[in-house]
Amino acid sequence: MLASKHTPWRRLQGISFGMYSAEELKKLSVKSITNPRYVDSLGNPSADGLYDLALGPADSKEVCSTCVQDFNNCSGHLGHIDLPLTVYNPLLFDKLYLLLRGSCLNCHMLTCPRAAIHLLVCQLKVLDVGALQAVYELERILSRFLEETSDPSAFEIQEELEEYTSKILQNNLLGSQGAHVKNVCESRSKLVAHFWKTHMAAKRCPHCKTGRSVVRKEHNSKLTITYPAMVHKKSGQKDAELPEGAPAAPGIDEAQMGKRGYLTPSSAQEHLFAIWKNEGFFLNYLFSGLDDIGPESSFNPSMFFLDFIVVPPSRYRPINRLGDQMFTNGQTVNLQAVMKDAVLIRKLLAVMAQEQKLPCEMTEITIDKENDSSGAIDRSFLSLLPGQSLTDKLYNIWIRLQSHVNIVFDSDMDKLMLEKYPGIRQILEKKEGLFRKHMMGKRVDYAARSVICPDMYINTNEIGIPMVFATKLTYPQPVTPWNVQELRQAVINGPNVHPGASMVINEDGSRTALSAVDATQREAVAKQLLTPSTGIPKPQGAKVVCRHVKNGDILLLNRQPTLHRPSIQAHRAHILPEEKVLRLHYANCKAYNADFDGDEMNAHFPQSELGRAEAYVLACTDQQYLVPKDGQPLAGLIQDHMVSGANMTIRGCFFTREQYMELVYRGLTDKVGRVKLFPPAILKPFPLWTGKQVVSTLLINIIPEDYTPLNLTGKAKIGSKAWVKEKPRPVPDFDPDSMCESQVIIREGELLCGVLDKAHYGSSAYGLVHCCYEIYGGETSGRVLTCLARLFTAYLQLYRGFTLGVEDILVKPNADVMRQRIIEESTQCGPRAVRAALNLPEAASCDEIQGKWQDAIWRKDQRDFNMIDMKFKEEVNHYSNEINKACMPFGLHRQFPENNLQMMVQSGAKGSTVNTMQISCLLGQIELEGRRPPLMASGKSLPCFEPYEFTPRAGGFVTGRFLTGIRPPEFFFHCMAGREGLVDTAVKTSRSGYLQRCIIKHLEGLVIQYDLTVRDSDGSVVQFLYGEDGLDIPKTQFLQPKQFPFLASNYEVIMKSKHLHEVLSRADPQKVLRHFRAIKKWHHRHSSALLRKGAFLSFSQKIQAAVKALNLEGKTQNGRSPETQQMLQMWHELDEQSRRKYQKRAAPCPDPSLSVWRPDIHFASVSETFEKKIDDYSQEWAAQAEKSHNRSELSLDRLRTLLQLKWQRSLCDPGEAVGLLAAQSIGEPSTQMTLNTFHFAGRGEMNVTLGIPRLREILMVASANIKTPMMSVPVFNTKKALRRVKSLKKQLTRVCLGEVLQKVDIQESFCMGEKQNKFRVYELRFQFLPHAYYQQEKCLRPEDILHFMETRFFKLLMEAIKKKNSKASAFRSVNTRRATQKDLDDTEDSGRNRREEERDEEEEGNIVDAEAEEGDADASDTKRKEKQEEEVDYESEEEGEEEEEEDVQEEENIKGEGAHQTHEPDEEEGSGLEEESSQNPPCRHSRPQGAEAMERRIQAVRESHSFIEDYQYDTEESLWCQVTVKLPLMKINFDMSSLVVSLAHNAIVYTTKGITRCLLNETINSKNEKEFVLNTEGINLPELFKYSEVLDLRRLYSNDIHAVANTYGIEAALRVIEKEIKDVFAVYGIAVDPRHLSLVADYMCFEGVYKPLNRFGIQSSSSPLQQMTFETSFQFLKQATMMGSHDELKSPSACLVVGKVVKGGTGLFELKQPLR
């Protein structure tokens, strides 16, 4: 079929990453580029320029001078630019810096311990063969060896480790296969990272004892070095180590000691070569990707430096011509800058050489500029170069060359340049980069895009194609004798007449385009279709005709955003001649999330038979009826069809013969064959058919001929109460639902009772269409939808019509009067709400209430304000409900079903009861972000209200309705709410989009294999059975006990469609059933015992008394008494039979059936829960069968086997890409979540993070410090526990000073000391609340507070004052001293490491002082920053993170100093606050014993700080204290009172570590009993363990996943992840199947630790291409190159990059062709 040159005959197996060496590149290069001008004055490429023709032609007019081919055939050739001086390789600059920092510049050895080096080498060797366990074994061997031998030599250590390693390498069977697995990759990168982090920062060299040289990097372009102050030389030893004839690398000169200088690349290179001689064996393993591909492949240190730069071929950086202007490519500009620098350096070196008559070598010689002996050389350029002497100029331009070379690689490396052109990194990265734009997704042919419009006359699985598309989209059809007639006609019709053809492909692959105008040419081609072309030696297959799309061809349709699998489905084409747009059936709208307000959709036309087959069978719309998220139906009829269907099937709707026939015909237009009809329901006076009969006629004609029609008992959406006009008469045993219109009964395909509405043909579960899908398959259910749509449309068009009028929304006069009265009442409820919220007395005056409310609003702690908000909402909700009761539904002028608006709402067509209430009753309370509208600074909510007005109207309670209009202020509130919705939508798309992308990139490789395990693309098992039971979510819908009766009533059909008899004849369920019986038997036997006893334990209990009676003498050995020894001996001497008796009794419960018998090959091996469901149902069924009179033919066993078969048929198919489905099922609903469902806690509630922020916290960040950590523990239901839990709650609650402080009086005065010193004196008097005020809630006494003031608070206050004054010179010296101590560059390193650990809090702005209440400056700044960040779209968000990462990496020490200065006092304060945070309250101080003790206390406070002059306190009650503070007079003044107040709010008098607040809430548990639950804000699990008699610790729960993992292990954390994600969605009423959540959780915890789904989590992936196509491609590329990684091309991303078929779905297997 395909011409030979198109048939692929080779396949990529893998990709390895590495670096070309300088020699290889020199060989590859065809030209040295020396001319900085790339085009001459005529616009032609200049010789030796960057567009020289030797590099290949830059555009189509030229010819390559190397291979003499034109633009289309020449793939381009590399060139190079020679650099006059060596520069650092920007790719490896950071690693070079670490190498230099971790090595000794004197003896050229690494400064890490030798043991670490040999250990790492051996560990990397064993990892290369995938021996993970050996890594830990080696660590053990080393530590044991170091313990046993004192001061071992490096050689001994090496021998010891090598011995074990060689054993492992010999016994290895896998070869290098095992090395490309996630766990091994993770282990390797961990070991290497750990080595760099811990061993490369020694203070002095262990070999020559020289102090460490401090190396620092600046602007990524130069290294500066501070040499150590003294050097230890060991004479004679140094040269002995070097091999013969090797030049000794220079050590450190005497002159350089203690100096700081610039380390040039050439001296760095010398040093590196010297290290390499000493440490080469080790560096080979550390940089395995930098091997020289030579005879002996080994690490090549010259890789760290560049002597020339490679120039890519011209075609990859084309010149863009616009008119007569030329615009060059950014890459070319960057290369040009390097060349200009090179020219300048060469000139400068010539000048220096002439002046000095020296070789161009770097020595610190200042050159006297006066002796102007160089007459020949042009020196005018020197004035352009910065620097004094020539050497300075040389260094400066050398650094400039370095930064220009950097820019070629990465334009962000130079932070100082303003005009930037993209470097290599910019070309690869981000959404617009090569990986994501051109490799992961490509533009395609044979696709169409147009606006969609609705059409309910085509089938649900069809798509209407306009003629414009039909003549352009073609399919390559091979010509055969049986289709030649059709194809001839197509060729004759030509490209413009449908059905025609556009082109014919001959046997040799040449193409003949069919002319639109020349009919004779087309006829000639048509006649030769079957005759082989002349001149071809052997005919290679047949001709191929590219024919137009025709009816019935399959197309893939897609609407963006493609959030989940149903966003791409296959439809059959239906050509519509007169149209210009795509036409889509209404039923598919929900799957695509499409509406017809201008949406566009894409259509793709598959070009191979394989693709078409997949589309027809798997991707077809009929097969996509259920959504993978939770198995709910997607397709369903909408709006008009609901109203029409409900009206048509209502009792009393009759049709004459003509009408009946017309409707049946309209419903079944495309049925072939006889139509079965029903006899009329009414015969006299003339025959009439009911609407129900019309629907039944459709059903029995659609259901396939050879299947029994279905039986179904269900409910309609319209409830039974809606039909009741007046109270029914009392009848004994009256069941209101029985035979009512809300009960739908279908027997043998005939609708006998009930109205069909949204519940049956909308997108709702267990309706008529869903049941048809389940029993007869997708094709039938699709036809049911199609036919019903046509029928209902016809009914509306021909007989009924549908309209709304004002009459439908009018309210009766008496209801209106009631409504008015309630509205008047509601205006008075304001003061009542505020009083209730703030616990004010009834008698409080309005002014007092207003004052309190005003305070609550402007207080930093918003809890009171939230409380008032809640009370207001409760009040107005009460009034809203009253009004709604008065008006709806009996207050309406017309009632259901005559009321068309009610009909529309009830049947589910459109709208909700809320809409009808807004029209007829009132709009209700307007809420913004979960609160009432905020107040302006003036205290008004809108300018037309009074400040702090109480009326609900002023708080956004709208009493108007749309029927009678709303007032301007109410309209304004209404608009505010509308705007909020829009803003939310705009913001959340990007956030959830990025979240979904992260999950998809991680989980893309998870596929079900043929052994039913879920594995990642590298073969690592993530789950042994998908979702823990192996079931496919859409198939599980009818495996619920509620649906068993439906399956039983349709037994015949299901048995036939599932081939039950065949299965039973081949499968034997007995083995499995025996297993289930064994499990039941065990449970029956061990029902009472909670603890399982071992065999020896039961034996020893039995003989214990007998042994004790022996009174054995002797002493305890190894912790075992003589009695125990005797028992052990008796147990060992016991004969086999007796021992087996004990062992049998103590045998553990057999494993569950699923884990023993693989469910797909063992019939009846089902999950335990399902087995239990079947048992329960069987008993129920048997009981019912006894009661009922008519015996059912269905026996219990047959029902059981049917259910088991149904379960087995529901197993997930191998090849299912469950990872992608899980990712889509979490990502797609997250777009529907409003960004933050705001949940503002009042005083009695917990604050919780919800919505997308919480999802990001769990999935993307996996941060150890979550925003709202909490624990909850149920309290035992005993009197003692309930009494003690009250005091426990008090004990766990944190107390701040502000909560117990009544007031602070401050007096300020001046005083003059001697020597004219001026002072400012403050007298601060602190008055505390009396104990009675807080003893109920707080675990404190006044003495404790006073003790806190004396020991901690005054110190904090002085620190804060010092901080305020730090601008003035008096204290500057203190701070600078602190900073310089920490100035050493290892703090930069530890700082960076700390920062990297904290990086996972990218979005949790790090507030330094952990104790700060909700509003210190840092907190508000970070909040503001977060607000700004939230508005960025997700692409730029990703960029921001990358830049941040870069900044962190390049953090210079200067920054570190600044950070230390600002953070230090805070850190100190934080640590100080913690000191007091013991569980027990601070030591209780008894009343002072006399004057002496009192004097001591006062003295201690005075001496605690130089500023404190005097101190006094209340010796009687401990209710006040007074301190006098004397400060030197400053130019700057600050407000002491605000400082004291803010400190008092943040100073913690008493706390339990980690817990801020405690609440006791009453809940209902699973057994429907009331119980108390203790909830804490903050986490401290060990603390709660102390109260095991009060709290039921077995049911303790915490939302901090890390805390649970660290305390209870990773399996517990797994469950927490599942529960947390489920809870986030539950708030919005979204159900996601637990199988998806378990898969995501299993993946995140795969490595035994909880890892996030972000770029730090993907570092352990074994596929470098998967990492690169995710984020920070350059970073991952660098990593892969240095480590010499290999990609097996198994992950989906890697397959897409190289164009392989992804190993999933139908790509999981390959078919062998039988050749005979």
Swiss-Prot record:
Record note on cofactor: Two Mg(2+) ions are coordinated by both the catalytic residues and the nucleic acid substrate to enhance substrate recognition and catalytic efficiency.
UniProt-annotated binding residues for DNA nontemplate strand: 436
Region Mediates the interaction with TOP2A, residue ranges: 1067-1162
Name listed for the protein in its UniProt record: DNA-directed RNA polymerase I subunit RPA1
InterPro entries: DNA-dir_RNA_pol1_lsu_C, DNA-dir_RNA_pol1_lsu_N, DNA-dir_RpoC_beta_prime, RNA_pol_asu, RNA_pol_N, RNA_pol_Rpb1_1, RNA_pol_Rpb1_3, RNA_pol_Rpb1_3_sf
EC number: 2.7.7.6
Residues reported in the UniProt entry to bind Zn(2+) 1: 64, 67, 74, 77
Annotated source species: Rattus norvegicus
Top-level class of the enzyme under EC nomenclature: transferase
Ranges where the record places region Involved in RRN3 binding to Pol I complex: 475-549
Region annotation Bridging helix: where it falls in the sequence: 967-1008
Cofactor: Mg(2+)
Pfam families with a match to the protein in the record: RNA_pol_Rpb1_1, RNA_pol_Rpb1_2, RNA_pol_Rpb1_3, RNA_pol_Rpb1_4, RNA_pol_Rpb1_5
Residues that coordinate or bind DNA template strand: 431, 436, 443, 1256
GO biological process annotation, one example: rRNA transcription
Region of interest called Trigger loop, as start-end residue ranges on this chain: 1214-1255
Gene name as annotated: Polr1a
Residues that hold RNA according to the record: 559, 599
Compositional bias segments (type: Acidic residues): 1398-1419, 1429-1451, 1465-1477
UniProt record similarity statement: Belongs to the RNA polymerase beta' chain family.
PTM comment, free text: Phosphorylated.
Domain remarks: The clamps form the DNA-binding cleft.
Entry superkingdom: Eukaryota
Region (Funnel) location: 812-890
Span list, region Clamp: 110-201, 327-433
